[in-house]
Amino acid sequence: MLGEPRAFCRGTLRRAAWRRRLRGVRALLNRCVVFSHGKDAEPWGSKIVALAERARERGYSVESVDYRGIDSVEARLDKLLAACAALPAAPVLVGSSLGAFLAAAASRRVAASRLFLMAPAVDLPGLPTLPEMAACPTTVVHGWRDEVVPVEKGIALARAQRATLHVVNDDHRLHASLPRIVQWFDECLR
């Protein structure tokens, strides 16, 4: 008689463990990174290609929103929100320059799981005020020699969000720092 309850418990525990593993696998399959490129950049520029490769290595699916031909910040934001609405889970949002502004602006509305912002174009003339961002792990990378977005803007954003901040000896495009940026992005995905 004592053997029967144990057998039942063992079977129940095995099924529960299997369900937990299955949920974990589903969560892994649903992980997605959405890239948001800058004003004059392309959806598959060198930074995005390098970061997308690392995301795929980590088991993430990858999307890159194409804003070419769209000048309005609001229309770009709508396109990013629409891309995120189709996702099965909260995305990691990655952006560069204006794309970083868009990622930050969309983060709360799409419940982003993480933000990775490079040379974020925030608090600049002609741009709307940045809405409240998601309370999620955030990394900001900015170049000391940024000729488009003053480094102080990135520092202020990182301070306000209590984000991880990396300031590098680079310009707005951050190409010379790409190997380190890929490493920091890898840390962000863990």
Language-model segment annotations:
Residues 28-69:
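Short, surface-exposed "cap/lid" segments of acyl-processing enzymes
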Residues 39, 144-146, 168-171:
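Acidic beta-to-alpha connecting loop that harbors the catalytic carboxylate
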Residues 44, 147-153:
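Conserved alpha/beta-hydrolase "acid-adjacent" motif
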Residues 94-103:
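Gly/Ala-rich beta-loop-alpha elbow adjacent to hydrolase catalytic centers
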Residues 111-123:
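A conserved short beta-strand
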Residues 134, 140-142, 146:
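Short beta-strand/loop motif that positions the catalytic acidic residue
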Residues 159-173:
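Catalytic histidine neighborhood in serine/cysteine hydrolases
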Residues 175-188:
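Post-His helix in hydrolase/transferase enzymes
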